[in-house]
Protein backbone atom coordinates (compact mmCIF):
# COMPACT_ATOMS: atom_id res chain seq x y z
CA UNK A 1 0.00 0.00 0.00
CA UNK A 2 1.26 3.46 -0.92
CA UNK A 3 0.70 6.05 1.80
CA UNK A 4 -1.11 9.31 0.94
CA UNK A 5 -1.27 12.58 2.92
CA UNK A 6 -3.70 15.45 2.16
CA UNK A 7 -2.95 19.12 2.93
CA UNK A 8 -5.48 21.94 2.36
CA UNK A 9 -6.61 24.82 4.56
CA UNK A 10 -10.22 24.43 3.38
CA UNK A 11 -11.87 21.79 5.54
CA UNK A 12 -14.64 21.12 2.96
CA UNK A 13 -12.10 20.32 0.22
CA UNK A 14 -9.97 18.28 2.60
CA UNK A 15 -12.86 16.14 3.81
CA UNK A 16 -14.29 15.92 0.29
CA UNK A 17 -11.09 14.45 -1.17
CA UNK A 18 -10.70 12.10 1.79
CA UNK A 19 -14.21 10.70 1.39
CA UNK A 20 -14.76 10.63 -2.37
CA UNK A 21 -11.69 8.68 -3.49
CA UNK A 22 -11.56 4.90 -3.05
CA UNK A 23 -7.96 4.73 -1.85
CA UNK A 24 -7.72 0.95 -1.49
CA UNK A 25 -8.76 0.38 -5.11
CA UNK A 26 -5.68 2.39 -6.09
CA UNK A 27 -3.43 0.28 -3.89
CA UNK A 28 -3.12 3.21 -1.48
CA UNK A 29 -4.10 4.23 2.04
CA UNK A 30 -4.90 7.67 3.41
CA UNK A 31 -2.65 8.15 6.45
CA UNK A 32 -3.55 11.69 7.44
CA UNK A 33 -4.86 15.19 6.74
CA UNK A 34 -3.35 18.61 7.50
CA UNK A 35 -4.82 22.13 7.33
CA UNK A 36 -1.55 24.07 7.04
CA UNK A 37 2.00 23.62 5.86
CA UNK A 38 3.54 23.24 9.31
CA UNK A 39 1.13 20.49 10.29
CA UNK A 40 1.69 18.78 6.93
CA UNK A 41 5.47 18.88 7.34
CA UNK A 42 5.34 17.32 10.81
CA UNK A 43 3.12 14.51 9.56
CA UNK A 44 5.35 13.92 6.53
CA UNK A 45 8.43 13.60 8.77
CA UNK A 46 6.74 11.20 11.19
CA UNK A 47 4.54 9.15 8.85
CA UNK A 48 6.73 9.10 5.71
CA UNK A 49 4.01 9.15 3.00
CA UNK A 50 4.81 8.22 -0.58
CA UNK A 51 2.51 10.90 -2.05
CA UNK A 52 1.31 14.29 -0.75
CA UNK A 53 -1.65 16.12 -2.30
CA UNK A 54 -1.28 19.77 -1.25
CA UNK A 55 -2.89 23.13 -1.88
CA UNK A 56 -0.55 25.94 -2.95
CA UNK A 57 -1.93 28.63 -0.67
CA UNK A 58 -2.06 27.72 3.02
CA UNK A 59 -1.46 29.76 6.18
CA UNK A 60 1.90 29.65 7.97
CA UNK A 61 3.75 27.66 5.32
CA UNK A 62 2.38 27.52 1.79
CA UNK A 63 2.55 24.55 -0.55
CA UNK A 64 5.74 25.65 -2.29
CA UNK A 65 7.60 26.16 0.98
CA UNK A 66 6.39 22.74 2.07
CA UNK A 67 7.69 21.14 -1.14
CA UNK A 68 11.09 22.86 -0.76
CA UNK A 69 11.45 21.77 2.85
CA UNK A 70 10.37 18.18 2.24
CA UNK A 71 12.58 17.86 -0.86
CA UNK A 72 15.60 18.63 1.32
CA UNK A 73 14.93 15.78 3.77
CA UNK A 74 12.79 13.28 1.83
CA UNK A 75 13.38 13.77 -1.91
CA UNK A 76 11.49 10.57 -2.78
CA UNK A 77 8.12 12.03 -1.67
CA UNK A 78 5.89 12.74 -4.69
CA UNK A 79 3.58 15.78 -4.79
CA UNK A 80 0.29 16.59 -6.50
CA UNK A 81 -0.24 20.36 -6.31
CA UNK A 82 -3.68 22.03 -6.29
CA UNK A 83 -3.96 25.74 -7.14
CA UNK A 84 -6.42 28.40 -8.19
CA UNK A 85 -6.72 30.13 -11.57
CA UNK A 86 -3.89 32.54 -12.47
CA UNK A 87 -1.25 30.90 -10.29
CA UNK A 88 0.95 29.55 -13.10
CA UNK A 89 4.08 31.06 -11.51
CA UNK A 90 3.55 28.69 -8.60
CA UNK A 91 3.41 25.80 -11.06
CA UNK A 92 6.73 26.78 -12.64
CA UNK A 93 8.35 27.02 -9.21
CA UNK A 94 6.98 23.63 -8.17
CA UNK A 95 8.39 22.03 -11.33
CA UNK A 96 11.90 23.00 -10.19
CA UNK A 97 11.47 20.46 -7.38
CA UNK A 98 10.33 17.66 -9.65
CA UNK A 99 6.57 18.16 -9.28
CA UNK A 100 4.90 16.71 -12.38
CA UNK A 101 1.25 16.90 -11.38
CA UNK A 102 -0.34 20.34 -11.08
CA UNK A 103 -4.15 20.49 -10.96
CA UNK A 104 -6.25 23.63 -11.35
CA UNK A 105 -9.08 24.15 -8.85
CA UNK A 106 -11.84 23.23 -8.96
CA UNK A 107 -10.63 19.78 -10.00
CA UNK A 108 -12.77 16.68 -10.08
CA UNK A 109 -12.33 13.24 -8.62
CA UNK A 110 -11.15 11.69 -11.90
CA UNK A 111 -8.35 14.22 -12.37
CA UNK A 112 -6.97 13.45 -8.92
CA UNK A 113 -7.33 9.69 -9.49
CA UNK A 114 -5.53 9.92 -12.85
CA UNK A 115 -2.61 11.77 -11.25
CA UNK A 116 -2.46 9.25 -8.42
CA UNK A 117 -2.51 6.33 -10.87
CA UNK A 118 0.39 7.80 -12.85
CA UNK A 119 2.48 8.37 -9.73
CA UNK A 120 1.68 4.95 -8.26
CA UNK A 121 2.56 3.26 -11.58
CA UNK A 122 5.92 5.04 -11.52
CA UNK A 123 6.52 4.08 -7.89
CA UNK A 124 5.79 0.45 -8.76
CA UNK A 125 8.31 0.60 -11.61
CA UNK A 126 10.88 2.02 -9.22
CA UNK A 127 10.16 -0.74 -6.70
CA UNK A 128 10.61 -3.42 -9.36
CA UNK A 129 13.88 -1.80 -10.44
CA UNK A 130 15.13 -1.65 -6.84
CA UNK A 131 14.31 -5.33 -6.31
CA UNK A 132 16.09 -6.31 -9.53
CA UNK A 133 19.10 -4.20 -8.59
CA UNK A 134 19.21 -5.71 -5.09
CA UNK A 135 18.94 -9.22 -6.54
CA UNK A 136 21.74 -8.56 -9.04
CA UNK A 137 23.90 -7.09 -6.28
CA UNK A 138 23.26 -10.16 -4.14
CA UNK A 139 24.21 -12.45 -7.04
CA UNK A 140 27.32 -10.39 -7.78
CA UNK A 141 28.33 -10.41 -4.11
CA UNK A 142 27.86 -14.19 -4.07
CA UNK A 143 30.07 -14.58 -7.16
CA UNK A 144 32.71 -12.27 -5.69
CA UNK A 145 32.57 -14.13 -2.38
CA UNK A 146 32.97 -17.49 -4.14
CA UNK A 147 35.91 -16.16 -6.15
CA UNK A 148 37.55 -14.80 -2.99
CA UNK A 149 37.02 -18.09 -1.13
CA UNK A 150 38.51 -20.07 -4.03
CA UNK A 151 41.47 -17.70 -4.25
CA UNK A 152 42.17 -18.00 -0.51
CA UNK A 153 41.86 -21.79 -0.65
CA UNK A 154 44.38 -21.89 -3.49
CA UNK A 155 46.86 -19.75 -1.56
CA UNK A 156 46.56 -21.84 1.59
CA UNK A 157 46.99 -25.05 -0.42
CA UNK A 158 50.02 -23.61 -2.21
CA UNK A 159 48.38 -23.65 -5.63
CA UNK A 160 49.78 -20.90 -7.86
CA UNK A 161 47.36 -18.14 -8.81
CA UNK A 162 48.02 -15.60 -11.54
CA UNK A 163 46.22 -12.78 -9.78
CA UNK A 164 43.58 -12.18 -7.10
CA UNK A 165 40.04 -11.04 -7.91
CA UNK A 166 40.24 -7.31 -8.81
CA UNK A 167 38.37 -6.26 -5.66
CA UNK A 168 41.02 -7.96 -3.48
CA UNK A 169 44.21 -6.80 -5.22
CA UNK A 170 46.58 -5.29 -2.65
CA UNK A 171 44.08 -5.80 0.19
CA UNK A 172 45.61 -5.99 3.68
CA UNK A 173 44.18 -8.76 5.85
CA UNK A 174 44.76 -10.93 8.90
CA UNK A 175 44.05 -14.65 8.90
CA UNK A 176 41.82 -16.05 11.62
CA UNK A 177 42.56 -19.75 12.07
CA UNK A 178 39.90 -21.79 13.89
CA UNK A 179 40.61 -25.30 15.13
CA UNK A 180 38.43 -27.88 13.37
CA UNK A 181 36.39 -27.81 10.17
CA UNK A 182 33.51 -25.79 11.56
CA UNK A 183 31.17 -23.82 9.35
CA UNK A 184 30.77 -20.09 9.87
CA UNK A 185 27.11 -19.52 10.65
CA UNK A 186 25.00 -16.69 9.26
CA UNK A 187 25.06 -14.79 12.57
CA UNK A 188 28.86 -14.75 12.61
CA UNK A 189 29.01 -13.65 8.98
CA UNK A 190 26.52 -10.86 9.68
CA UNK A 191 28.45 -9.74 12.76
CA UNK A 192 31.69 -9.52 10.78
CA UNK A 193 29.95 -7.84 7.84
CA UNK A 194 32.29 -6.32 5.27
CA UNK A 195 35.28 -7.12 7.51
CA UNK A 196 35.05 -10.75 6.30
CA UNK A 197 36.97 -11.07 3.04
CA UNK A 198 37.08 -14.82 2.39
CA UNK A 199 36.61 -18.23 4.06
CA UNK A 200 38.02 -21.68 3.34
CA UNK A 201 38.87 -24.99 5.01
CA UNK A 202 42.32 -26.54 5.14
CA UNK A 203 42.59 -29.95 6.73
CA UNK A 204 41.69 -29.59 10.40
CA UNK A 205 41.43 -25.79 10.24
CA UNK A 206 38.86 -23.26 9.10
CA UNK A 207 40.57 -20.13 7.79
CA UNK A 208 39.00 -16.68 7.52
CA UNK A 209 40.62 -13.68 5.88
CA UNK A 210 39.45 -10.52 7.66
CA UNK A 211 40.32 -6.85 7.25
CA UNK A 212 43.51 -6.04 9.13
CA UNK A 213 41.82 -3.67 11.60
CA UNK A 214 39.06 -6.16 12.49
CA UNK A 215 40.98 -8.12 15.15
CA UNK A 216 38.87 -6.85 18.06
CA UNK A 217 35.59 -7.56 16.26
CA UNK A 218 36.81 -11.06 15.38
CA UNK A 219 37.81 -11.74 18.98
CA UNK A 220 34.31 -10.78 20.15
CA UNK A 221 32.51 -12.91 17.55
CA UNK A 222 34.62 -16.01 18.16
CA UNK A 223 35.27 -15.61 21.89
CA UNK A 224 34.25 -19.22 22.58
CA UNK A 225 36.33 -20.78 19.78
CA UNK A 226 39.94 -21.97 19.81
CA UNK A 227 41.73 -19.70 17.41
CA UNK A 228 44.83 -17.80 16.39
CA UNK A 229 45.19 -14.59 14.40
CA UNK A 230 48.05 -13.88 12.02
CA UNK A 231 50.11 -10.77 11.55
CA UNK A 232 48.74 -8.32 8.98
CA UNK A 233 49.77 -8.77 5.36
CA UNK A 234 48.52 -8.66 1.78
CA UNK A 235 46.04 -11.35 0.83
CA UNK A 236 48.43 -12.67 -1.81
CA UNK A 237 50.77 -13.69 1.04
CA UNK A 238 48.03 -15.64 2.82
CA UNK A 239 49.82 -18.96 2.32
CA UNK A 240 52.90 -17.80 4.23
CA UNK A 241 50.79 -16.05 6.87
CA UNK A 242 48.88 -19.29 7.40
CA UNK A 243 52.02 -21.42 7.73
CA UNK A 244 53.72 -18.98 10.11
CA UNK A 245 50.65 -18.67 12.33
CA UNK A 246 49.84 -22.38 12.38
CA UNK A 247 53.47 -23.21 13.22
CA UNK A 248 53.67 -20.60 15.99
CA UNK A 249 50.33 -21.70 17.43
CA UNK A 250 51.01 -25.43 17.31
CA UNK A 251 47.59 -27.07 17.40
CA UNK A 252 46.11 -23.74 18.52
CA UNK A 253 45.78 -24.92 22.11
CA UNK A 254 49.11 -26.59 22.86
CA UNK A 255 52.30 -25.68 24.69
CA UNK A 256 53.75 -23.80 21.70
CA UNK A 257 51.54 -20.81 22.44
CA UNK A 258 52.36 -20.87 26.15
CA UNK A 259 56.08 -21.12 25.40
CA UNK A 260 55.72 -18.03 23.27
CA UNK A 261 53.87 -16.25 26.09
CA UNK A 262 56.56 -17.15 28.62
CA UNK A 263 59.27 -15.83 26.29
CA UNK A 264 57.22 -12.68 25.81
CA UNK A 265 56.92 -12.17 29.59
CA UNK A 266 60.69 -12.55 29.98
CA UNK A 267 61.33 -10.05 27.19
CA UNK A 268 58.76 -7.54 28.45
CA UNK A 269 59.25 -7.92 32.20
CA UNK A 270 60.13 -4.24 32.61
CA UNK A 271 57.13 -3.07 30.59
CA UNK A 272 54.51 -1.62 32.98
CA UNK A 273 51.86 -2.24 30.29
CA UNK A 274 52.48 -5.98 30.29
CA UNK A 275 49.08 -7.61 30.73
CA UNK A 276 47.10 -10.51 29.31
CA UNK A 277 44.96 -8.17 27.19
CA UNK A 278 48.03 -6.38 25.79
CA UNK A 279 49.86 -9.62 25.03
CA UNK A 280 46.81 -11.18 23.38
CA UNK A 281 45.76 -8.18 21.32
CA UNK A 282 49.04 -6.51 20.33
CA UNK A 283 51.57 -9.35 20.31
CA UNK A 284 49.90 -12.75 19.84
CA UNK A 285 46.71 -11.69 18.02
CA UNK A 286 44.56 -14.17 19.91
CA UNK A 287 41.44 -13.95 22.03
CA UNK A 288 42.44 -12.82 25.58
CA UNK A 289 39.75 -14.86 27.37
CA UNK A 290 40.76 -18.05 25.59
CA UNK A 291 44.47 -17.27 26.07
CA UNK A 292 43.97 -16.70 29.81
CA UNK A 293 42.19 -20.05 30.22
CA UNK A 294 44.89 -21.80 28.18
CA UNK A 295 47.69 -20.23 30.24
CA UNK A 296 46.07 -21.30 33.54
CA UNK A 297 45.50 -24.80 32.17
CA UNK A 298 49.14 -25.18 31.06
CA UNK A 299 50.94 -23.45 33.96
CA UNK A 300 48.54 -23.77 36.89
CA UNK A 301 48.70 -20.00 37.43
CA UNK A 302 46.77 -17.02 36.18
CA UNK A 303 48.71 -14.84 33.77
CA UNK A 304 48.83 -11.93 36.24
CA UNK A 305 49.98 -14.21 39.08
CA UNK A 306 52.72 -15.67 36.93
CA UNK A 307 53.96 -12.22 35.87
CA UNK A 308 53.98 -10.98 39.48
CA UNK A 309 55.85 -14.08 40.69
CA UNK A 310 58.49 -13.82 37.97
CA UNK A 311 58.93 -10.10 38.64
CA UNK A 312 59.34 -10.60 42.39
CA UNK A 313 61.76 -13.52 42.02
CA UNK A 314 63.79 -11.38 39.62
CA UNK A 315 63.65 -8.50 42.12
CA UNK A 316 64.90 -10.72 44.96
CA UNK A 317 67.79 -11.90 42.83
CA UNK A 318 68.72 -8.34 41.88
CA UNK A 319 68.47 -7.14 45.49
CA UNK A 320 70.96 -9.83 46.50
CA UNK A 321 73.59 -9.14 43.84
CA UNK A 322 73.14 -5.38 43.30
CA UNK A 323 73.27 -4.11 46.85
CA UNK A 324 74.13 -0.56 45.80
CA UNK A 325 70.98 -0.19 43.66
CA UNK A 326 67.90 1.25 45.35
CA UNK A 327 64.68 -0.69 45.77
CA UNK A 328 62.79 1.93 43.74
CA UNK A 329 65.20 1.49 40.80
CA UNK A 330 64.81 -2.28 40.86
CA UNK A 331 61.02 -1.91 41.11
CA UNK A 332 61.00 0.31 38.03
CA UNK A 333 63.26 -2.10 36.11
CA UNK A 334 60.82 -4.98 36.61
CA UNK A 335 57.71 -3.13 35.49
CA UNK A 336 56.28 -1.54 38.64
CA UNK A 337 56.90 1.92 37.21
CA UNK A 338 57.44 4.88 39.51
CA UNK A 339 55.51 3.31 42.38
CA UNK A 340 57.89 1.87 45.01
CA UNK A 341 55.19 1.86 47.72
CA UNK A 342 53.01 -0.48 45.68
CA UNK A 343 56.05 -2.66 44.97
CA UNK A 344 56.76 -2.87 48.71
CA UNK A 345 53.19 -3.97 49.44
CA UNK A 346 53.28 -6.68 46.75
CA UNK A 347 56.77 -7.77 47.82
CA UNK A 348 55.74 -8.15 51.49
CA UNK A 349 52.61 -10.07 50.54
CA UNK A 350 54.73 -12.50 48.52
CA UNK A 351 57.75 -12.87 50.88
CA UNK A 352 56.41 -11.82 54.28
CA UNK A 353 59.13 -9.17 54.44
CA UNK A 354 59.48 -5.59 53.25
CA UNK A 355 62.25 -5.01 50.68
CA UNK A 356 64.40 -3.39 53.41
CA UNK A 357 63.85 -6.32 55.78
CA UNK A 358 64.68 -8.75 52.98
CA UNK A 359 67.97 -6.98 52.28
CA UNK A 360 68.93 -6.87 55.96
CA UNK A 361 68.20 -10.57 56.25
CA UNK A 362 70.50 -11.18 53.29
CA UNK A 363 73.21 -9.30 55.16
CA UNK A 364 73.32 -6.24 52.92
CA UNK A 365 72.77 -2.57 53.57
CA UNK A 366 69.36 -1.18 52.79
CA UNK A 367 69.33 1.02 49.68
CA UNK A 368 66.29 3.35 49.65
UniProtKB/Swiss-Prot annotation:
> What job does the chain carry out?
Member of the two-component regulatory system YesM/YesN.
One Pfam family assigned to this protein is Response_reg
Where is this chain primarily localised? cytoplasm
HTH araC/xylS-type domain boundaries: 259-361
Which GO cellular component does the record give, naming just one? cytoplasm
For biological process, the GO terms are: phosphorelay signal transduction system
Where is this gene product found?
A: Cytoplasm
Q: What is this protein called?
A: Uncharacterized transcriptional regulatory protein YesN
Q: Which residues bind DNA?
A: 278-299, 327-351
Which of the residues bear the PTM 4-aspartylphosphate? 55
Enumerate the GO terms in the molecular function aspect: DNA-binding transcription factor activity; sequence-specific DNA binding
Q: Any idea which UniProt keywords this protein has?
A: Cytoplasm, DNA-binding, Phosphoprotein, Transcription, Transcription regulation, Two-component regulatory system
Q: Which residues form a coiled coil?
A: none
Which residue intervals define the domain Response regulatory in the entry?
3-120
Give the gene name.
yesN
Modification(s) after translation: Phosphorylated by YesM.
The record's InterPro entries line, in alphabetical order, gives: CheY-like_superfamily, Homeodomain-like_sf, HptR, HTH_AraC, Sig_transdc_resp-reg_receiver
Amino acid sequence: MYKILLADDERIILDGMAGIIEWESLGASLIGKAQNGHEAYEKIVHKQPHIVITDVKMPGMDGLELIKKVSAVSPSVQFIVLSGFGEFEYAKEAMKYGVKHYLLKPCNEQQIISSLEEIIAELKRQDVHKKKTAHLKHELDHIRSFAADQYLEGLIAGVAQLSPPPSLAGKKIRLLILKGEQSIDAAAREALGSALTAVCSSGEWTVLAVEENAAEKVAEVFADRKMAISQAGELRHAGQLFRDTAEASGDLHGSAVISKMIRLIADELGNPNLSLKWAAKDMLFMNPDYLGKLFKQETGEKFSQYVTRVRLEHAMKQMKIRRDVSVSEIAEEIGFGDNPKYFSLVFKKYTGLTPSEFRRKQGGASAG
